[in-house]
């Protein structure tokens, strides 16, 4: 029979690792390796009212005397809290505070399971030694063997003549053998001495010393290298090194050796500031670019910071600069994509209260490849105040802005602009619709200065413009049966009348104004231009209609919107009077569609059609097939005629089609590819193909790309050095899970590779 021997004194050593966080869930596609479990571990669960610090000993036979030796024989089980030992035989010397166990021995706690031939534990020092062991780290997929395992008084592990792997039993994809392994339970990382790495049971690498993480905690060390080759940079090898400086700081340093250009180094520092602020600092440097005439030095530095100081204050800052216009086009930066041609430098501090807020902002935007430089905002002050229901459900809003515009060119005029907008809003809301009346007064004062007295903008200008906006919307709905499916159909007509007074603004310079898009939702805006340099006069009515289909679970399956603005009077204010179009009686007809065609097929599209001239101003359509989260097939087409090319100041027509896919070929093999073709130029714009294989303990990705390059004229390289128009190359990523890398590599980031990264184009509310 079983004999339960309850010791009220905690004589058992604490053979357990410190854990700051619960064991994380194992990521998708990892293989769970189950350690052995003794049936006697479940016996303690049958006992009730036992203090977790008490030791429970269960065995078939026992011979014990108080304060002397106790011998246990037959299916022995020691338990204390989450710590368990199972063995055939055990001896507890209470006087010497020693425990020994032999025969089918299993030790288990919440972090590790160990099998061994023998165990010798010294309870006074909380240490133990196990011989001929096999171990499994819970939740980490790490397991291995050791001729001897020592558990120190600091709860660390010392493994002699040991090995470990993350592959399942019988899989010899990789194995690390070492003379000594030390695992720090507090820091959750391991040190390894005199190690050999075996791949497919073949020794391929000797490592005198290395460190590896044994959990998801950050750990200093080398990450796996990346290999690539391209016509732009030649053979490229990146070997990132991660430095865990402190809990709130870390640094990644990446030497990137390129055969065509030289050594390119990238440094990234991440930090936390307080409880709600974070930031990042980047510095990239290429000394003497061998591929360019004159071998110039090329560099990038970036700083970004954002967060909340307290409940009221917010801060944001972002600054980036590069050595030349083609930096992102030539080099694989960690900060921006190769298609980015703007560098935003912004600093902003904001303060929020319930009825008001204020902010101070500075901004400088650098446009790569552009000779025309935008104005700098130095600074801008915003103050907004709002009061709900001041009288008869009428809301009062007051928005104000003071902006000082500077320019790098001393010959350009500068200005200070004060813009004040008091408004009264009367919103009427009901279950079947809404109607909003809005009255604004747009008051703007410009203080303009220039070195040229003949400049028409060298004067102060005051502008006062009234604005009236009436917007109404009605919601109709009814049950509908389509192809045997029950839906709820809505019809949502909306009408807007907009009146904006006219004032001559030809004596005001252009500082931050641009034309806004005329998409469906843009038709119902109360402004035609961004910024406040130009306020377009308007006397117009906009009509629109939206229809939706919602299923029994209230998920949106279909949405179609169409609308147009009718001009009662022609607008006299244009961005460029020399480009005035023939007077039109209406805007473009804008339509948008998002729908689930059938089960896993989705379509999304938009069109802007000039009804007076019968021309298509802009159109795009996307067809998606998404049978599951890891399966995607997307077809797309877009058409934009007469688009301004800012590099040449000429006009181009864009007619482009594309295909993108992500598909698992097997449980372990993924394929990602995309292809975009310019129908107008009859050439491929981009081709990308990637194959990724992932097993339980290693992963590899091989990809090929071919893309058009955007080469800018550059003062650093005036001749453009005979730059190639297209770039092609091959990339290789390899990860051994458990040796400085973690899996999976990720298919989603492959979708973001290339010029046209994947976006889900549908806006269905489901």
UniProtKB/Swiss-Prot annotation:
GO biological process, one term: Gram-negative-bacterium-type cell outer membrane assembly
A GO cellular component entry from the record: transporter complex
HAMAP family linked: LPS_assembly_LptD (MF_01411)
Signal peptide segment: 1-18
Gene3D superfamilies registered for this protein in UniProt: Lipopolysaccharide (LPS) transport protein A like domain
Membership in a protein family: Belongs to the LptD family.
Keywords: Cell outer membrane, Membrane, Signal
Function text: Together with LptE, is involved in the assembly of lipopolysaccharide (LPS) at the surface of the outer membrane.
Principal localisation: membrane
Subunit: Component of the lipopolysaccharide transport and assembly complex. Interacts with LptE and LptA.
Source organism phylogeny: Bacteria, Pseudomonadati, Pseudomonadota, Gammaproteobacteria, Alteromonadales
Pfam families, per database record: LptD (PF04453), LptD_N (PF03968)
Subcellular location: Cell outer membrane
Protein name per the record: LPS-assembly protein LptD
């Amino acid at each position: 029979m079983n004999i339960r021997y309850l010791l009220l004194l905690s004589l058992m050593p604490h053979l357990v690792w410190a854990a700051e966080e619960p064991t994380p869930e194992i990521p998708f596609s990892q293989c769970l390796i189950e350690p052995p479990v003794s049936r006697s571990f479940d016996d303690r669960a049958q006992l009730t009212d036992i203090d977790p610090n008490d030791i429970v000993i269960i065995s078939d036979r026992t011979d014990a005397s108080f304060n002397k030796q106790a011998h246990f024989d037959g299916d022995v089980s020691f338990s204390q809290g989450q710590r368990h030992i199972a063995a055939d035989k055990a001896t507890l010397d209470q006087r010497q505070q020693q425990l020994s166990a032999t025969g089918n021995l299993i030790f288990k706690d919440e972090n590790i399971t160990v099998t061994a031939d023998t165990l010798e534990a010294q309870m006074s020092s909380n240490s133990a030694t196990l011989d001929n062991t096999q171990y499994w780290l819970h939740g980490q997929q790490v397991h291995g063997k050791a001729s001897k395992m020592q558990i120190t008084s600091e709860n660390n592990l010392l493994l002699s003549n040991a090995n470990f792997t993350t592959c399942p039993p019988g899989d010899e994809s990789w194995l690390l053998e070492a003379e000594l392994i030390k695992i720090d339970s507090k820091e959750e990382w391991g040190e390894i001495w005199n190690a050999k790495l075996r791949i497919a049971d073949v020794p391929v690498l000797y490592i005198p010393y290395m460190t590896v993480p044994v959990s998801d905690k950050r750990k200093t060390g080398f990450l796996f290298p990346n290999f690539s080759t391209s016509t732009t940079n030649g053979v490229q090898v990146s070997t990132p090194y991660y430095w865990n400086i402190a809990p709130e700081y870390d640094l990644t340093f990446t030497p990137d050796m390129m055969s065509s250009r030289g050594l390119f180094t990238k440094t990234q520092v991440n930090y936390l500031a307080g409880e709600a602020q974070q930031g990042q600092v980047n510095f990239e440097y290429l000394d003497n670019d061998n591929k360019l005439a004159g071998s110039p030095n090329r560099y990038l530095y970036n700083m970004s910071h954002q967060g909340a100081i307290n409940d009221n204050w917010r801060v944001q800052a972002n600054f980036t600069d590069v050595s030349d216009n083609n930096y992102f086009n030539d080099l694989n930066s960690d900060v921006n994509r190769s298609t980015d041609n703007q560098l935003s430098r912004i600093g902003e501090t904001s303060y929020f209260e319930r009825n008001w807020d204020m902010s101070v902002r500075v901004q400088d935007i650098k446009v790569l490849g552009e000779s025309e430089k935008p104005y700098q905002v130095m600074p801008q002050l915003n103050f907004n105040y709002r009061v709900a229901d001041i009288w008869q459900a009428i809301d009062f809003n007051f928005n104000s802005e003071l902006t000082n515009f500077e320019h790098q060119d001393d010959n350009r005029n500068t200005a200070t602009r004060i813009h004040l907008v008091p408004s009264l809003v009367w919103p009427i809301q009901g279950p079947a619709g809404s109607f909003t009346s809005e009255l604004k007064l747009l008051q703007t004062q410009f203080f303009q200065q220039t070195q040229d007295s003949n400049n028409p903008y060298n004067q102060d200008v005051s502008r006062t413009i009234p604005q009236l906006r009436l917007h109404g919307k009605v919601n109709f709905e009814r049950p509908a049966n389509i192809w045997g499916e029950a839906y709820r159909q809505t019809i949502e007509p909306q009408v807007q009348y907009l009146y904006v007074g006219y004032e001559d603004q030809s004596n005001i310079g252009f500082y931050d104004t641009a034309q806004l898009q005329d998409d469906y939702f843009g038709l119902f805006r109360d402004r035609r231009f961004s910024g406040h340099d130009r306020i377009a006069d308007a006397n117009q009515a906009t009509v629109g209609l939206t229809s939706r289909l919602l299923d029994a679970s209230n998920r949106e399956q279909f949405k179609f919107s169409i609308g147009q603005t009718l001009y009662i009077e022609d607008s006299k204010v244009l961005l460029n009077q020399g480009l005035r179009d023939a007077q039109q009686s209406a805007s473009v007809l804008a339509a948008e569609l998002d729908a689930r065609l059938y089960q896993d097929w989705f379509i999304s599209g938009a069109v802007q059609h000039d009804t007076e001239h019968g021309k298509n101003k802009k159109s795009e359509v996307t067809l998606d097939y998404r049978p599951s989260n890891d399966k995607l097939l997307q077809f797309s087409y877009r058409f934009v005629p007469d688009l301004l090319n800012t590099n040449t100041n000429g006009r181009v027509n864009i007619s482009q089609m594309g295909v993108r896919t992500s598909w698992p070929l097997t449980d372990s093999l993924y394929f990602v590819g995309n292809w975009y073709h310019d129908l107008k130029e009859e050439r491929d714009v981009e081709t990308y193909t990637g194959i990724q294989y992932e097993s339980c303990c290693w992963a590899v990705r091989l990809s090929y790309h071919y893309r058009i390059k955007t080469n800018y004229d550059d003062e650093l390289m005036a001749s453009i050095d005979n730059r190639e128009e297209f770039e092609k190359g091959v990339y290789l990523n390899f990860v051994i899970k458990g040796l400085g890398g973690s899996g999976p590599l990720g298919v989603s980031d492959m979708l973001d590779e290339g010029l046209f990264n994947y976006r889900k184009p549908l806006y269905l509310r489901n």
